[in-house]
Regions:
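Hydrophobic, well-ordered secondary-structure elements that form the walls
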Residues: 408, 448, 460, 488, ...
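TPR/TPR-like (Sel1-like) alpha-helical repeat modules
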Residues: 169, 314-318, 383-384, 425-428, ...
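Terminal, low-structured helical/coil segments at or just beyond the last alpha-helical repeat
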Residues: 478-503
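Acidic, proline/glycine-rich low-complexity intrinsically disordered segments
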Residues: 1-370, 375-382, 387-399, 404-407, ...
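Amphipathic alpha-helical protein-interaction segments enriched in hydrophobic
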Residues: 357-361, 400-409, 436-452, 477
Length: 503
């Protein structure tokens, strides 16, 4: 067990080692403590067999703060000796490398790294500040430059696909490559740059596969290869990678969500539900997991079960997944008043950047519910707010296909068929299904839904039939339940698409 994300929830001297070993799927656990005094630290570590509580090895270290990283290599080597294990080259490089001699830079890097792994916009903004502080304190800190490059690349792939963000990612990566081109973290950043910025999935996979050959037990690399394989349409290979990533990092929310999403895409809903329930046993208040469970029941057409779960879904902010689950249940039930009231209480303010994305997504959801409930003026107000925010974002992100896809839905809600189709076509043209099996399928689904809302069965039905042949979110159950397809219900071709049953 190498990943920190799976172990950080446990205190340093946990009570039930056997249960923790079972949760993590490991035979041995390393626990320790650090005491700091001025510029010195005293470190205690011990290796314990989880099943028997037997102490296999223990050691103490006294170090100066600027030499603390050397302890990692000593501890790892001692543990490997005790377990008759052999550390591979890249793994040994990571744990024995002296990252920096500046303790303040080290502290800033560790804080930034912890926030980066939360993978949300709010945490990323603060993580960026810490990482920039780290490289300012130590301009030769290659590992910090590499993580800063990944952070900029992650932001570019989401809500900030601007030229400035691309340039920041490239500059940080180039600095890391100049400093230590063979460092594992730097090679990892190269792979993520190709994945998130260039969207060259073949090149990204090559970088990551080369790195995996040297670092085979890195859950992060396996997870990235899994997501890339999905986008390439290599679903079996994706499953293999994501299963291995989750096995190595079983407490990681990201690894679990990736495994769940794969099963959702491949319509293996029973398997997805088991993963969700296992996660909720560990984190019963995880709103995203609760929302995922609601969505699984919705996609199975089991709306009573979805109702039972959604009664415990009380988001405090306009989080995307819970809001979508609430909106979708109202759509499928065709009962809008309660969901409209719940969403109105969460109305976010318009901000900038990622805040505008959340603002727009929320207003599309609320606008859809008001449109379907017959409140045309209320729906128009929501769609107009979303349109204005998205158009503002588009000025600085003209190559962001997600913005065109969202604008297509907005203009459809406003009744502007020409503008809706123009934006939908633009999104599909920029990212076709042949280029990206996840995002491309989503864009084609948006276009087909718009065609259906305008009653254009001759275009919508063949598109939906095609999407049903691929992994994705279009299913016969969705076609049967979603009111956006009501204008097609009298068409025998559409009726045939609704006849199949999900797995």
């Amino acid at each position: 067990m190498i990943s920190r994300t799976s172990t950080q929830k446990y205190k340093s001297a946990p009570d039930n080692l056997r249960e923790i070993g079972k949760q993590l799927g490991v035979a041995n656990l390393l626990e320790g403590s650090v005491q700091k005094a001025a510029d010195a630290v005293h470190i205690n570590v011990q290796l314990i067999r989880a099943a028997t509580d037997e102490h296999l090895w223990a050691e103490s270290y006294n170090r100066k703060l600027n030499d603390i990283f050397t302890v990692e290599g000593e501890v790892a080597g001692a543990i490997a000796d005790q377990l008759n294990a052999k550390l591979r080259g890249a793994e040994k490089q990571v744990i024995t490398a002296k990252l920096t001699s500046n303790p303040e830079a080290s502290d800033a890097y560790l804080r930034g790294s912890a926030l980066f792994r939360k993978s949300d916009d709010a945490s990323m903004d603060t993580a960026q500040q810490f990482l920039e502080q780290a490289v300012r304190l130590d301009p030769g800190f290659a590992t910090a430059w590499a993580l800063l490059a990944r952070l900029h690349a992650w932001q570019f792939s989401g809500s900030d696909a601007t030229d400035a963000r691309r340039a920041s990612a490239r500059a940080a990566l180039d600095t890391a490559l100049r400093l230590q081109p063979d460092l594992a973290e730097v090679r990892l950043a190269q792979g993520y740059y190709q994945y998130w910025v260039e969207k060259d999935y073949a090149a990204a996979a090559r970088y990551l596969e080369q790195l995996m050959a040297k670092w085979p037990n890195n859950a992060e690399i396996l997870g990235a290869l899994g997501r890339i394989s999905e986008r390439q349409g290599h679903w079996d290979q994706a499953g293999n990678y994501l299963e291995r990533a989750f096995a190595l990092d079983p407490m990681s929310r990201v690894a679990r969500r990736n495994a769940i999403d794969l099963r959702f895409q491949t319509r293996e809903y029973g398997s997805a539900l088991r993963l969700i329930d296992d996660g909720l046993n560990l984190q019963p208040d995880d709103l995203d997991l609760i929302a995922c469970k609601v969505l699984v029941y919705q996609w199975l057409g089991q709306l009573d079960q979805a109702d039972a779960v959604i009664s415990g879904l009380h988001p405090r902010t306009a989080e995307d997944l819970p809001v979508f689950a609430i909106t979708n249940q109202a759509r499928f039930r065709r009962a809008y008043a309660g969901a409209i009231s719940q969403l109105q209480a969460l109305q976010p303010d318009r901000g900038s950047g990622s805040a505008d994305w959340a603002f727009s997504t929320f207003n599309i959801c609320l606008g859809d519910l008001r449109r379907l409930s017959g409140n045309a003026s209320g729906a128009k107000a929501n769609y107009t707010q979303a349109r204005d925010a998205l158009e503002a974002l588009l000025k600085n992100q003209p190559n962001n296909a997600d913005l065109y896809n969202m604008l297509a839905s907005v203009y459809c809600g406003l009744g502007d068929r020409k503008a809706a189709m123009k934006n939908a076509d633009r999104a599909v043209e920029m990212t076709p299904l042949s280029k990206d099996a996840i995002t491309g399928a989503g864009y084609e689904s948006t276009r087909a839904r718009i065609e259906a809302q305008f009653g254009d069965g001759d275009h919508a039905i063949p598109a939906l039939a095609r999407l049903l042949k691929f992994p994705g979110y279009v299913t016969p159950t969705v076609l049967r339940l979603d009111p956006d397809f009501d204008l097609l219900r009298g068409d025998p071709r559409f009726q045939k698409l609704c006849e199949e049953n999900p797995k």
